Design a protein with these regions (language model features):
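Charged docking surfaces used in two-component/phosphorelay signaling
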Residues: 13-24
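Acidic catalytic/metal-coordinating carboxylates
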Residues: 34-37, 60-63
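Short, Lys/Arg-enriched segments at the junction into DNA-binding effector domains
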Residues: 4, 115-172, 178
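Conserved acidic carboxylate
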Residues: 9
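DNA-recognition element of transcription regulators
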Residues: 106-119, 155-165, 190-209, 217-223
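Receiver (REC) domain active-site loop signature in two-component systems and cognate sites
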Residues: 56
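Basic, amphipathic DNA-recognition helix from helix-turn-helix-like DNA-binding domains
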Residues: 66-132
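Active-site beta3 strand of CheY-like receiver
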Residues: 45-51
Length: 227
């Protein structure tokens, strides 16, 4: 069965090109021309994944995703954007984006990123390892990070969960930045490296209730989780 994609993009010529390319990959694509229409179509279609432009008339991609994430934390969302500042990336991830792709982009890279997000969504838990991180317990399959004393649970965005899983698997060791970028983004360009920095900062915030937990940056090499 084909995967349902909601593509929200106000450049209709670009949207048509992307739709045609995705349909050759067995995706079923619906197009919305702005955030307001995208929000309406989301509730009608309940797509398997959303690909959303940031800058649009009537309602921006940020506003649309903020509304969706009030009730849906699971459906993968990938932002398309010409906005490359760290603040923009932070805003997107804070709103619940799973990935970012900078315009202009190559269709094969978009397809790879979409399939990676969908693969996480549909994967089955088989012998999932539960990690204890100081005062926290982390289930990488469900992306649940639970504080053991308060039992407060945070559902991490998929990309943050993937990063934390790699750090937990190599606790006390350096996880090379390049490895994380290639595994999760497919390339190690500057834009993705800045996105990784943003997500590491967010993970530090999630874990800040235990002062003994540190994620350190080994300059020019990678990241290390210390307890």
């Amino acid at each position: 069965m084909s995967c349902r994609v909601l593509l929200v993009e106000d450049e209709l010529s670009l949207a048509s090109i992307v739709r045609d390319a995705l349909e050759t990959q067995d995706f079923e694509v619906a197009i919305a021309a702005d955030g307001a229409e995208g929000l309406h179509r989301y509730f009608d279609l309940r797509p398997d994944i959303l690909v959303v432009d940031v800058m649009m008339p009537k309602m921006s991609g940020f506003e649309m995703v903020k509304s969706i994430r009030q009730s849906d934390r699971e459906t993968p969302i990938l932002f398309l954007t010409a906005k490359t500042t760290v603040d923009d990336v932070v805003t997107g991830f804070n709103l619940g984006a799973n990935d970012y792709l900078k315009k202009p982009f190559a269709i094969p890279e978009l397809v790879v990123r979409m399939k990676a997000l969908l693969g996480h969504k549909t994967s089955q838990a088989k012998g999932t390892t539960i990690f204890t991180i100081g005062e926290f317990q982390f289930n990488p399959e469900t992306a649940h990070l639970q504080h053991l004393s308060t039992e407060e649970t945070t559902i991490l965005p998929r990309r943050e969960a993937d990063i934390l899983q790699r750090l937990c698997q190599h606790q006390g060791e350096i996880v090379p930045t390049q490895n994380i970028l290639l595994d999760l983004w497919g390339n190690d360009d500057f834009f993705n490296a800045r996105s990784l920095q943003v997500l590491i900062t967010r993970l530090r915030g999630h874990l800040s209730h235990d002062p003994h937990i540190r994620i350190i940056n080994v300059r020019g090499t990678g990241y290390k989780l210390l307890l």
